[in-house]
């Protein structure tokens, strides 16, 4: 058996896996930058910057397509065990990142409509929720980059906190709408934006769970603690 040839085959495969992870992290960093920029334009009420964020979403979509092709090429080389889990994570994580980018673009898009109306005090609460979402995404990417089980577990646990903050903002906006019907239209935009941010947190948790799968295989995870109680809100 030509051990030198086998060594080069294995090293080439490992190098390609490492490049794949690097590309996925780069895609994630672009998505986080989009999210943080979207939160910024909501606060600054900057339509032109919001338009740029919406247009830049295409770059994330293109990266996902490119990464998907790379993953398929690696899969054809017959990965085993841990490498197969790397391949599966390489398919799943970019899909979550792509959705994060979509939700960030949606926040920016709705900010343009919101800018035609007087500013609302709840914008500050929306930003706080968005910062939690952005931190969740950053930490999930860090757990993937470093293969860190502890960070991934923490992201999963913190999703309940994000849900609770979303529910609090949901209540706040409903109350504000009931106090004055003129608040209904802008509050509805903020409700949709808040839901986008809550879903970003869910996708960050998906990434963290894929890291745990990558590290531990098919080990059963406990059910996520969910604190999104918006369906049970009673304002009577």
Swiss-Prot record:
Q: What is its main location?
A: cytoplasm
An example molecular function term from Gene Ontology annotations: protein homodimerization activity
Compartments (UniProt record)? Cytoplasm
Protein origin, superkingdom: Bacteria
Q: Which GO terms describe its biological process?
A: intracellular phosphate ion homeostasis; negative regulation of phosphate metabolic process; negative regulation of phosphate transmembrane transport; phosphate ion transport
GO cellular component, as recorded: cytoplasm
Keywords for this protein: Cytoplasm, Phosphate transport, Transport
Task: Cite the Pfam families for this sequence.
Answer: PhoU (PF01895)
- Keyword Transport applies: yes
Output the InterPro entries linked to this UniProt entry.
P_transport_PhoU, PhoU-like_sf, PhoU_dom
Q: Which family does it belong to?
A: Belongs to the PhoU family.
According to the record's subunit comment, the protein's assembly and interactions are: Homodimer.
Function noted in UniProt? Plays a role in the regulation of phosphate uptake.
What is the name of the protein in this document?
Phosphate-specific transport system accessory protein PhoU homolog
Species of the source: Xylella fastidiosa (strain 9a5c)
The organism that produces this protein has a lineage beginning with: Bacteria, Pseudomonadati, Pseudomonadota, Gammaproteobacteria, Lysobacterales
């Amino acid at each position: 058996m030509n051990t030198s040839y086998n060594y080069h085959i294995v090293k080439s495969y490992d190098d390609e896996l490492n490049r794949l992870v690097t590309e996925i992290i780069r895609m994630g960093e672009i998505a986080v930058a989009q999210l943080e920029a979207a939160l910024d334009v909501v606060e600054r009420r900057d339509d032109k910057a919001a338009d740029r964020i919406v247009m830049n979403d295409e770059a994330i979509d293109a990266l996902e397509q490119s990464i998907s092709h790379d993953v398929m090429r690696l899969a054809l080389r017959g990965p085993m065990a841990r490498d197969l889990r790397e391949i599966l994570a390489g398919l799943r994580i970019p899909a979550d990142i792509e959705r994060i980018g979509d939700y960030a673009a949606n926040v920016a898009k709705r900010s343009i409509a919101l800018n035609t109306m007087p500013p609302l005090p709840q914008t500050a609460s929306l930003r706080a929720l968005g910062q939690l979402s952005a931190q969740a995404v950053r930490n999930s990417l860090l757990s993937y980059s470093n293969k860190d089980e502890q960070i991934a577990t923490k992201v999963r646990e913190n999703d309940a906190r994000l849900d609770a903050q979303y529910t609090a903002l949901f209540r706040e906006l409903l109350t504000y709408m009931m106090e004055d019907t003129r608040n209904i239209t802008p509050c509805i935009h903020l409700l949709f934006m808040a839901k986008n941010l809550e879903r970003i947190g869910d996708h960050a948790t998906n990434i963290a769970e894929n890291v745990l799968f990558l590290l531990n295989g098919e080990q059963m995870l406990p059910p996520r603690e969910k604190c999104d109680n918006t369906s049970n809100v009673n304002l009577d």
